Every structure is written in structure tokens, then in C-alpha cells.
């Protein structure tokens, strides 16, 4: 009888322990979660929306940070909202952060305010990675001025190491952009952003140009540009591709014929997202 009781106790303990382990495993499967307008700084513009996938973990869940365009003076994270479901469908295991940043005016938020906001947003996400149950592997995806901020962050700063960059028609040489534009309004925007010209403020133009910070350690980069872009000439992306290539950095450049700046038809956007998905899967492990 004594032995039977002991066996029953052991069996009961084993059963309870097994149930406890199964319960713990169930608890660890986190549901999908969306957090809107999360502040990463004290300014009202320093906010982001965060999309966390189900089943995420600090070991396996990588992060895509999306940075909207708008010539550094306009635009909003809402501009990228249409692309969130597309990325979630293609890369379902990724978390996504869609960020706002301070926009420049003639009297405030001159560069490098936007660069500093990028750093602050990334640092916030890294600090909160444990709470969000995401890893510290980051992909930056930006369009136009947002792509400029993405490449500048990735190339200029060794830490944190950015895993990959997706660059939609972003400028990378600010002096060349200023000097080559045939649109007076664009020149005035750059003067307002930089609080000067390449002649009056050469150091800031140099320090704000991603092309100047490319090294053989730079992040893998995929670039998309239209050959009829009059806002950011395709020469900017060609120059970036040439420098990345010369230094042995993994890169791809796709130039779409007869396409301008910002608005591309659905078939081209689908092609770009196909290529983006493949590039990220290949280069971010």
C-alpha cells in the first residue's frame, strides 16, 4: 500500500508539473498588439505607432522602422498607413514602428532635428525591446526625405548596427541636391531646412549627406528610383549604388522607367515590395 501511495504521489506530481509547463508555454504566446501615438520624446511630434505580431519574442522578432517623406517640412506617419498591412502580410514575423518626427519650419526644427529624432526613436525602441518582446535587429524603410534619414542613420552611426535599409528615392548628397535642382521652391526648402546654403553652411551639408558616411561596413541597402524624378534626381541613387558597390557593400538598385517622384502605379509598387521582401529575407538573419 505504501509503495502504491508513493507511486500515486509521483504520478500526480509529474502530471501537475507537466500541466504547469504547458500552461507556462501557453502564457508565453503573446497576442498581436497595436500601440498608437507612443511618445519617444517630449515634443508632440515625437510619436510612433507600433505593430507587434502574435507569438513574438525577444529572440526572433525583428523590427522594421518606417520613416515617411515630405521634404522634411510636411508629411505624417499616416502617409505610410496603407503599407502596414502589406508588410504584415509579407513579413508576418516582423514588428513595425511607423514614426513621426519634428518637421522643419523657417524658424524652428532646422536640421539636424530630424536626424536627432531618428536616433531618439531607435534608442526608445531598443530600450523598450524587452517590454515589447522584440529583438534588436532593425530594418529602416523610408521614402524621399524619410529615406534620407534612414540612410543617414544607417551609415553615419556604428551603433546600433542597422541590419538593412530600404531606400525609396532618397537624397544622399545634400549639396548636389541643392545645386542640381531646377525647382526654385525645392531650393528654398533646403535653405530653410539647413538654415543656409552649401556655401554658407558647408559643414552641415557635409554632415547631413549619407553618401559621405558609406564604408565597407555599411548596412545592406536596396534602392528604388524613377528615371523621371525631378525632385530627387536618379543620379543621387546611382551615386549611392556606385559607392556601395566600390566598397563591397551588399546592394541593389532598381530604376523604373518613366516614373517620377512619390506616386507610382500599383504594379510597380508590387514589384518593389516583392524585391524588398526578398532582399530582407536574404540579408536579415
Residue ranges and their predicted role:
Residues 78-98:
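Short amphipathic alpha-helix adjacent to the substrate-entry channel of hydrolases
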Residues 60-70:
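Short beta-strand element of the alpha/beta-hydrolase
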Residues 217, 222-225, 229:
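Short beta-strand/loop motif that positions the catalytic acidic residue
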Residues 22-57:
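N-terminal cap/lid segment of alpha/beta-hydrolase-fold proteins
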Residues 230-236:
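Conserved alpha/beta-hydrolase "acid-adjacent" motif
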Residues 176-213:
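Mobile cap/lid helix-loop segments that gate and shape the active-site cleft of serine hydrolases
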Residues 120-180:
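Primarily recognizes the serine-hydrolase "nucleophile elbow" in alpha/beta-hydrolase
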Residues 238-285:
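C-terminal catalytic histidine-bearing segment of alpha/beta-hydrolase fold enzymes
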Amino acid at each position: 500500500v505504501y509503495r502504491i501511495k508513493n507511486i500515486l504521489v509521483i504520478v500526480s506530481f509529474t502530471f501537475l508539473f507537466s500541466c504547469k509547463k504547458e500552461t507556462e508555454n501557453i502564457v508565453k504566446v503573446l497576442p498581436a498588439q497595436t500601440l498608437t501615438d507612443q511618445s519617444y520624446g517630449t515634443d508632440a511630434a515625437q510619436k510612433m505607432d507600433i505593430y507587434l505580431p502574435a507569438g513574438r519574442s525577444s529572440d526572433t522578432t525583428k523590427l522594421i522602422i518606417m520613416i515617411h517623406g515630405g521634404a522634411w517640412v510636411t508629411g505624417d506617419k499616416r502617409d505610410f498607413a496603407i503599407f502596414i498591412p502589406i508588410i504584415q502580410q509579407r513579413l508576418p514575423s516582423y514588428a513595425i514602428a511607423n514614426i513621426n518626427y519634428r518637421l522643419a519650419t523657417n524658424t524652428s526644427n532646422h536640421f539636424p532635428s530630424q536626424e536627432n529624432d531618428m536616433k531618439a526613436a531607435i534608442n526608445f525602441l531598443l530600450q523598450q525591446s524587452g517590454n515589447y518582446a522584440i529583438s534588436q535587429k532593425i530594418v529602416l524603410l523610408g521614402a524621399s526625405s524619410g529615406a534620407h534619414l534612414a540612410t543617414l542613420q544607417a551609415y553615419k552611426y556604428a551603433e546600433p548596427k542597422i541590419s538593412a535599409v530600404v531606400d525609396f528615392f532618397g537624397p544622399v548628397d545634400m549639396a548636389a541636391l541643392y545645386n542640381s535642382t531646377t525647382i526654385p521652391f525645392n531650393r528654398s526648402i533646403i535653405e530653410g531646412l539647413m538654415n543656409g546654403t552649401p556655401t554658407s553652411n558647408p559643414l552641415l551639408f557635409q554632415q547631413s549627406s549619407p553618401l559621405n558616411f558609406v564604408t565597407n561596413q555599411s548596412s545592406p541597402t536596396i534602392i528604388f528610383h524613377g528615371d523621371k524624378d525631378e525632385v530627387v534626381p536618379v543620379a543621387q541613387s546611382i551615386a549611392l549604388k556606385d559607392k556601395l558597390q566600390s566598397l563591397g557593400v551588399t546592394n541593389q538598385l532598381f530604376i523604373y522607367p518613366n516614373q517620377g517622384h512619390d506616386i507610382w502605379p500599383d504594379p510597380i509598387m508590387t514589384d518593389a515590395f516583392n524585391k524588398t521582401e526578398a532582399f530582407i529575407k536574404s540579408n536579415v538573419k
